[in-house]
Amino acid sequence: MHLLMSLFGVLAVMQQQLAVRAAAYIPDSDRNTKTLQNDLQVERDGNYRYAYETSNGISATQEGLGGVSVQGGSSYTSPEGSVISVSYVADETGYHPVGDHIPKVPDYILRALEYIRAHPYQVKDYYTGELKTVAHDAAAFNVYTRNIQDQTTPRSRPSSTPKTIYLTHPPTLSDAPTRRPLRQRQNDSRRR
């Protein structure tokens, strides 16, 4: 038992030493890194701009428009030696990164989105009972395909396609179908 406790103690000390060494590890390429450029401009209206670059190849720039939109980019060198670059725009439609290392949207997904956009469908209006044609908004479709490069581009929507229909109020109880009581089964002569 004493031997087992000693073994656990030695293992705990070794694990602690390895954790300290792993946390203190800094690759040789990063050990003597210098900041080559560091610029920051902040204006009273909320607009800002920053850029930095280090001697080990890491760089970033970003420009913000008063909390409404941001655009920028960054790059670094991967452990394999290739330069990884990302440029992006973030605005009311979301975050849109662009980079060679980011997977492209498969062609079959683009074709499916195009088919959905090009084929409006009909919905029965709950209140009036009439059929209304609903089309997908081209602007929403463009958000999905904004940053797709070297892929098929969506065709513009024909001007005859109707706009999206939105119902203006929630259903009320008077619009709901009426309830009917369930009929009770009569004694069936087959069941005995």
UniProtKB/Swiss-Prot annotation:
It holds the Pfam family Chitin_bind_4. InterPro entries: CHIT_BIND_RR_consensus (IPR031311), Cuticle_Struct_Prot (IPR050468), Insect_cuticle (IPR000618). Keywords: Cuticle, Signal. The keyword Signal applies. Residues 1-15 form the signal peptide. Residues 149-192 are annotated as: Disordered. It comes from the Eukaryota. This is Pupal cuticle protein. One of its GO terms (cellular component) is chitin-based extracellular matrix. GO terms for molecular function: structural constituent of chitin-based larval cuticle. Residues 149-163 have a biased composition (Polar residues). Component of the cuticle of the pupa of fruit fly. PROSITE patterns: CHIT_BIND_RR_1 (PS00233), CHIT_BIND_RR_2 (PS51155).
